[in-house]
Amino acid sequence: MKCVDVIIPTYKPDQKFFQLLHRLDRQSLPPQKIIVINTGKEFFDEEAVDALHLQTPVEVHHIEVDEFDHGQTRNQAVKYSHAPYFICMTQDALPANQKLIEHLLAPMDEEVKLVYARQVPNQDAGHIERYTRQYNYPKKSQIKSEKTKAVYGIKNYFASNVCAAYERESFVEIGGFVPKTILNEDMLYAAALMKKGKKVCYCADAVVFHSHEYSGLRQLSRNFDIAVSQVQYKDIFAGLKSEKEGIRLVLGTARHLFKIGQAKEIPRLVYISGCKYLGFFMGKHYEKLPKWLVKKCSSNKKYWEKKDV
């Protein structure tokens, strides 16, 4: 039986986080411990965690709001783990069944050193978000490496740490997640792993409930940050175009909406897609924009306060 810890960064955790702890505690392969790295001690209710009476130990570490960094905060949490494997999750992802951890660790071998889960939409997700999850997380598992870039394009390095398992030895060898990055720390890690000759597995059998109904402006900000990351790491993303993948998703979503009799959703799809494209386009050219506009467009405003644009 493989020994594994679960790492969860939190910020103002709500009831879904406590459901997550409850479901992790009842896994067929339970974690050795759950490591919570929480931003803002005043927002965390440790008594509520104790009230769950979990069999799995929950270890909580607090950081200040201005200390949070997508990569570095997770790296810090990994240092509290001594298991040969660890799983990174977000506070709003819920295991769909008791086999999540078991399925996540099953593909690990001499070549596969990162396995990420399938995300299926929450019950309240709309038609557009449902199709987006279906598009990004198909029913068939995948093995990806440097040799599969021609097959998967920009998605070759896609390995969402909403729910993903990592092998400690290779993680330490690579140096962990890239610190002080605006976003995409999970993709950057997957790319570094592949460049070391290792492989990434998308495991469709490992399933979590996770989806968002983002507004157009939120989509703009998120895609702005994604594009900024791609500009800042040109050597990694060179030759891997996101635009074509985006067009395929939009056209596929439109066809799906017509097929299920939801053509009335097309205007919203056009609006959301336009916001995504505008954000991505602006992010690709962020170096030419005034600092106030860059900060306005970004969803990670703290990042720009610590950085000269």
Regions found by a protein language model. Give the residues of each.
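Short, well-formed alpha-helical segments that are part of the catalytic scaffolds
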Residues: 13-26
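A conserved acidic beta->alpha catalytic loop
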Residues: 38-48, 93-94
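Glycine-rich, basic loop-to-helix element that forms the pyrophosphate-binding segment
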Residues: 64-81
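Short aromatic/hydrophobic "clamp" motif used to bind/position activated sugar donors
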Residues: 86
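Conserved donor NDP-sugar-binding/catalytic core segment of glycosyltransferases
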Residues: 98-130
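A recurrent flexible, glycine/aromatic-enriched loop bordering the glycosyltransferase active site
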Residues: 146-166, 182
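Acidic donor-binding loop at a coil-to-helix junction in glycosyltransferase catalytic cores
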Residues: 182-189
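Non-catalytic, C-terminal membrane-associated alpha-helical segments of glycosyltransferases
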Residues: 225-228, 232, 239-309
